[in-house]
């Protein structure tokens, strides 16, 4: 493995010039044939392979390698500064043996940039320092080391810091496990699938926007971070800012996370604690996380274009009076999944209302739990334009407490335009009686036509 990536490249030959040369050679050959006697033979123009143009041509057996003129192909040792893709390189002079593996731990005390020609390995908690910005280039791969408890790896953007991680559709920024064999320039490895969970922690972003906390405190410790780590605090504290800006997350893939830090306490794929509406979050993918896919603890940030696949608990989770909008999401559950939505309301006197809209939820035919949604703890907000398919018979949308049912009756919890494929009756139910262990003892099906959308 190299200690650094050498960026020198051979300049590729201009394709237009090559075409002119070939046409000229053909024209000269034709003239010679017409003017010579039958005993003369036309000259043969020898065309040399272009070994650094990213095209398989002129005898090359692979792109820019093989044949009589280019370097050996994949069985050869990578040569990382010759302008040719060879050996185990995943691009020209990058990836494989040519990639620098940079291990990162502790606090980032200066503005930092991570680039796509390296692989970054999170060793434990990596925290963006207060007042500092972590910039991650499109196509960059970040891998988390295995570990649990205080050793669980995670990237934490604490209050007062920023992350600028803006990928593209062609070059997403990928957070994954160190076990993943994905390399520089690639978008997927070959050795892990969506059922590989808990291989590392996750991505945590914290801010100072509104949150509703028990006893009306103004800041609390985020789920997934031990209580003695002060960088895990979120909430306004003494500086409420609903427009708080924690940066940008766009075209991000988070895979194989959810490391355990305590009994029943795992890190979510993407955790957002009191994140403000000045932050941009869109095109986020979470695959194979032990706990929730994306969880919103308070805050005002909007999020759009979300995909959660094969989560071990809930796909989209709302808590502590989150009051932003989640728009255009897709949830694909598997046999380990619980709810597509788990929605909790305020814990203190501050209230807030969420909007969750334009979402498709795909259930699992084999999940032991696998419910549509659970609305709990005084939940308030609107869930609309939902398309649900693939859930087992008997699964439902739960109004899981009397205060939630009352919010529905009072118009503070609303449901609009749900289309549920496969059921002609309502899937919405109120849990009206529980035992001491919080198990459901009695359920009432709600058939009010204003409650549920068209079924088919």
Q: Can you name each region flagged by the protein language model?
A:
Residues 103-130, 134, 145-160, 168, ...:
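Extracellular beta-rich repeat passengers
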Residues 1-34:
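Sec-dependent bacterial lipoprotein signal peptides
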Residues 54, 58, 83, 87, ...:
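Register-specific beta-strand positions within repetitive beta-rich fiber domains
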Residues 24-25, 29-54, 62, 70-81, ...:
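Bacterial Sec-dependent N-terminal signal peptides
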Residues 60, 89, 254-257:
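Surface-exposed interaction patches
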């Amino acid at each position: 493995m190299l200690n650094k990536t050498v960026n020198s490249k051979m300049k590729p030959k201009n394709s237009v010039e090559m075409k002119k040369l070939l046409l000229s050679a053909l024209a000269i050959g034709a003239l010679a044939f017409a003017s010579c006697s039958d005993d003369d033979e036309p000259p043969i123009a020898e065309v040399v392979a272009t070994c650094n143009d990213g095209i398989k041509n002129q005898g090359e057996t692979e792109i820019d390698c093989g044949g009589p003129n280019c370097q050996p192909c994949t069985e050869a040792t990578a040569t990382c500064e010759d302008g040719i893709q060879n050996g185990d390189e995943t691009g020209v002079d990058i990836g494989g043996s040519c990639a620098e593996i940079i291990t990162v731990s502790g606090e980032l005390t200066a503005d930092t940039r991570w680039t796509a020609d390296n692989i970054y390995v999170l060793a434990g908690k990596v925290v963006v320092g207060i007042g500092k910005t972590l910039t991650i280039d499109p196509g960059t791969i970040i891998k988390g080391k295995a570990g649990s408890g205080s050793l669980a790896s995670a990237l934490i953007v604490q209050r007062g810091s920023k992350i600028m991680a803006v990928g593209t559709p062609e070059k997403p920024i990928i957070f994954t496990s160190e076990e993943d064999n994905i390399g520089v320039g690639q978008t997927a490895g070959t050795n892990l699938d969506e059922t590989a969970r808990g291989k590392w922690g996750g991505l945590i972003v914290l801010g100072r926007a509104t949150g509703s906390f028990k006893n009306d405190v103004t800041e609390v410790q985020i789920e997934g971070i031990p209580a003695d780590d002060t960088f895990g605090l979120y909430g306004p504290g003494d500086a409420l800012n609903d427009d708080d800006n924690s940066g940008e997350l766009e075209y991000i893939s988070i895979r194989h996370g959810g490391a355990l830090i305590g009994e029943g306490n795992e890190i979510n794929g993407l955790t957002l604690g009191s994140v403000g509406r000045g932050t941009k979050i869109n095109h986020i993918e979470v695959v194979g996380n032990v706990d929730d896919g994306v969880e919103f603890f308070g805050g005002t940030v909007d999020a759009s274009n979300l995909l959660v696949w094969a989560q071990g608990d809930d796909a989209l989770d709302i808590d502590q009076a989150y009051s932003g909008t989640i728009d255009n999401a897709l949830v694909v559950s598997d046999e380990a999944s619980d709810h597509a939505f788990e929605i909790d309301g305020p814990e203190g006197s501050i209230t807030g209302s969420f909007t969750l809209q334009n979402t498709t939820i795909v259930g699992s035919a084999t999940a032991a739990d696998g419910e549509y949604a659970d609305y709990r703890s005084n939940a308030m907000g609107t869930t609309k334009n939902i398309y649900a398919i693939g859930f087992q018979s008997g699964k439902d949308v739960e109004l899981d407490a009397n205060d939630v049912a009352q919010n529905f009756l009072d118009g503070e919890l609303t449901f609009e335009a749900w289309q549920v494929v496969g059921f002609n009756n309502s899937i919405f139910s109120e849990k009206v009686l529980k035992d001491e262990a919080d198990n459901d003892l009695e359920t009432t099906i709600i058939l009010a036509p204003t409650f549920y959308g068209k079924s088919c």
